[in-house]
Amino acid sequence: MAAIAASEVLVDSAEEGSLAAAAELAAQKREQRLRKFRELHLMRNEARKLNHQEVVEEDKRLKLPANWEAKKARLEWELKEEEKKKECAARGEDYEKVKLLEISAEDAERWERKKKRKNPDLGFSDYAAAQLRQYHRLTKQIKPDMETYERLREKHGEEFFPTSNSLLHGTHVPSTEEIDRMVIDLEKQIEKRDKYSRRRPYNDDADIDYINERNAKFNKKAERFYGKYTAEIKQNLERGTAV
């Protein structure tokens, strides 16, 4: 009887130990899941915070002027230049000479070539600047008519050089040659403008494989890139021998 009782005690203790181990294992797994859940929760909050910051920054960028990045870069460059000038002045050095030491020979040659150009294209900034550049280009093409100048000066005498009391406005009548020259120049400008925005003429004999103009442009683009790969398939479809 004593042996049986001892064996039952051992079995009970073993069962209790296994139950305790199982409970401890379950607690560890639950703790791992909770820790993983907390990590995911923190990651979600961090992602939400970053997304909100990105949305705010994008909204700020959209509200800024179109050329804000270029202006900002220009201002930063000017600030750096001012700081360098102050540093050189504090050291008693000539800023222009110090700046030349930092410029390579290739950059110096390129800069000199750019300075020698009569009407350099500095890139698009706004429509007013583009119009001003065109105005300078057109005025430089005007050739003075010295014969007409001398004739008008002899005709008007001292009044040819106007003062605050002169009343020459509306008295000049352009000649036929001047009007023709202006018309020719305007026609050249219109022709040049049409080359930049040339609309292709409509071909009545061309195959219609589109439903609207946008689809026609897409089909032309697809034909340009994939036409050589689909030529045989199109021919088989037209002959009726496609598999």
From Swiss-Prot:
Cell compartments where the protein resides: Nucleus
Cross-link (Glycyl lysine isopeptide (Lys-Gly) (interchain with G-Cter in SUMO2)) at residue(s): K143, K234
Nucleus is among the record's keywords: yes
GO molecular function: RNA binding
Cellular component GO terms, alphabetical: catalytic step 2 spliceosome; nuclear speck; nucleoplasm; nucleus; post-mRNA release spliceosomal complex; Prp19 complex; U2-type catalytic step 2 spliceosome
Tissue distribution: Abundantly expressed in the heart, skeletal muscle and kidney. Expressed at lower level other tissues.
GO BP: embryonic organ development; gastrulation; in utero embryonic development; mitotic G2 DNA damage checkpoint signaling; mRNA splicing, via spliceosome; positive regulation of cell population proliferation
Alphabetical keyword list: Acetylation, Coiled coil, Isopeptide bond, mRNA processing, mRNA splicing, Nucleus, Spliceosome, Ubl conjugation
Chain segments annotated as coiled-coil in the UniProt record: 66-91
Residues with N-acetylalanine modification: A2
Family the entry assigns: Belongs to the SYF2 family.
Function of the molecule: Involved in pre-mRNA splicing as component of the spliceosome.
Oligomeric form and interacting partners: Identified in the spliceosome C complex. Interacts with CCNDBP1.
Protein name in the entry: Pre-mRNA-splicing factor SYF2
